[in-house]
């Protein structure tokens, strides 16, 4: 039964909502209120490999489409996300809706809702006991193709210079029972809240600097911080660095082509965590495309 805690307990009960290393320029992944905030429609795909060097480490892939409607007072989006950890597989399909309220001449408040379906699959009979490498009879039958509802919400206050965002991407505790021992597991439990704030400073020669603070709070776990800064250069290049209180540092870069396609890369390295000696980092690639010219600052 030792592997049960590893295969399901830690991943199913202790895992936060999957989010991008380059979340600052892809805030719609964390907060549905950002969907449709831009001037035109957009597409984004990404892939992230966690903890390279560890067999069965998380692999996540994401694809999304977002567009404003009704003169940008509201927006809609559709996304699909896959997360594989060991033999555990999660596939989610979500729809987002956001609407905007103008507070005064300069300030806006935007709200967002997210709803979807999560498919969960875990081939327990293929897990093997160490060191004998034989199947555990307690893992029979498998957890196969459970479909569950997902729901999230968020809000963002913003103007041309800064934003303050808060969201809970998944607020529903989905549970199910497996095998003859009535083992139960929960998906995305406990809930995780994300509070983020960012300000854009205009420097010389067309350079802009954007510091960002992300506070991540999960019930039953310590609060941790992500401190980041992105520099926007006039050559359509942006570079960034993130420092996390969990003991890791992230470097990122993103380039926007003249046809409005953007390509981003990020690498995350553990610097004080015990896991550092077993892996060589986490890596993420992002490709985005705008269907027309024009884009607001926050994406």
Where in the sequence are the language-model features?
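Subset of outer-membrane beta-barrel
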Residues: 15-299
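Sec/Tat signal peptide C-region and signal peptidase I cleavage site
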Residues: 8-16
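Bacterial N-terminal signal peptides
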Residues: 1-7
């Amino acid at each position: 039964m030792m592997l049960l805690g590893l295969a399901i307990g830690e991943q199913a009960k202790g895992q936060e909502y999957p989010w991008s290393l380059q979340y600052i320029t892809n805030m719609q992944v964390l907060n549905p209120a950002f969907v449709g905030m831009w001037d035109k429609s957009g597409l984004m795909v990404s892939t992230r490999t966690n903890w390279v060097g560890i067999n069965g480490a998380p692999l996540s892939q994401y694809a999304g489409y977002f567009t404003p409607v009704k003169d940008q007072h509201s927006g809609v989006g559709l996304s699909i996300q896959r997360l594989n950890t060991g033999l555990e597989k999660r596939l989610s399909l979500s729809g987002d809706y956001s609407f905007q309220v103008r507070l005064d001449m300069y300030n806006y408040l935007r709200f967002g809702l997210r709803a979807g379906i999560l498919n969960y699959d875990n081939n327990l009979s293929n897990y093997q006991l160490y060191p004998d490498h034989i199947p555990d009879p307690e893992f029979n039958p498998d957890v196969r193709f459970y479909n569950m509802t997902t729901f999230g919400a968020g809000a963002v206050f913003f103007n041309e210079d800064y934003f303050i965002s808060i969201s809970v991407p998944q607020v529903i505790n989905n549970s199910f029972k497996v095998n003859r021992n009535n083992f139960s597991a929960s998906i995305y439990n406990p809930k995780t809240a994300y509070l983020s704030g960012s300000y854009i400073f205009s420097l010389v020669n067309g350079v802009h600097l954007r510091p960002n603070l992300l506070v991540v709070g999960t019930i039953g776990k310590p609060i941790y911080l992500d401190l980041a800064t992105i520099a926007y250069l006039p050559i359509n290049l942006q570079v960034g660095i993130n420092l996390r209180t969990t003991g890791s540092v992230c470097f990122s870069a993103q380039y926007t082509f003249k046809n409005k396609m953007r390509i981003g890369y990020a690498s995350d390295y553990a610097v004080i965590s015990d896991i550092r000696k077993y892996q060589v980092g986490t890596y993420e690639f992002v490709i985005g495309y705008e269907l027309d010219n024009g884009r607001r600052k926050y994406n």
